[in-house]
């Protein structure tokens, strides 16, 4: 059973992000390491994705007046392509609606396979550049 809880160990969560994103950082020559990631996520709303009590992913959110920004969605390598990303997005939607926002926004590397998940989940591309798709989904 999948569940969510506030992140207790930001260092471990940052390490998962670094391990998942390292190939993208290398591809785009982004100079990030675990300490930089931890610094960036410290002020976000951080949740762990749990499977039978084991942390298998993370979501990081930021809110403004009308939008919830999915700043990061990670699923550990061994648990990818098993529905955990879709479950995490559903939790993001629930949290966004409960906060009173009417839109989810995110940015994804153009070369990321997660792009397909976001399209399947109802996100549309609002803009793009050489590295990223900026996407959003209106909430009801």
PLM regions and their residue ranges:
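A short beta-loop-alpha structural element at the N-terminal edge
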Residues: 1-15
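Short alpha-helical
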Residues: 12, 56, 65, 112-113
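C-terminal "cap" of GNAT-fold acetyltransferases
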Residues: 38-39, 64, 100-115, 119-140
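Conserved beta-strand in the GNAT
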Residues: 48, 54-62, 69-74
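Conserved acetyl-CoA-binding loop-helix of GNAT-fold acetyltransferases
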Residues: 75, 81-94, 119-120
């Amino acid at each position: 059973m999948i569940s969510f809880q506030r992140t207790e160990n930001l260092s471990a969560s940052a390490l998962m992000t670094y391990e998942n994103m390292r190939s993208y950082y290398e591809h785009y020559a982004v100079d990030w390491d675990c300490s930089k990631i931890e610094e960036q996520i410290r002020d976000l709303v951080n949740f762990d994705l749990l499977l039978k009590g084991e942390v298998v992913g993370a979501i990081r959110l930021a809110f403004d007046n009308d939008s919830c920004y999915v700043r990061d969605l990670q699923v550990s390598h061994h648990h990818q392509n098993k529905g955990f990303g879709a479950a995490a997005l559903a939790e993001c939607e629930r949290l966004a609606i409960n906060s009173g926002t009417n839109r989810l926004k995110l940015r994804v590397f153009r070369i990321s396979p997660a792009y397909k998940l976001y399209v399947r989940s109802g996100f549309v591309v609002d803009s793009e550049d050489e590295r990223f798709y900026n996407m959003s989904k209106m909430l009801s």
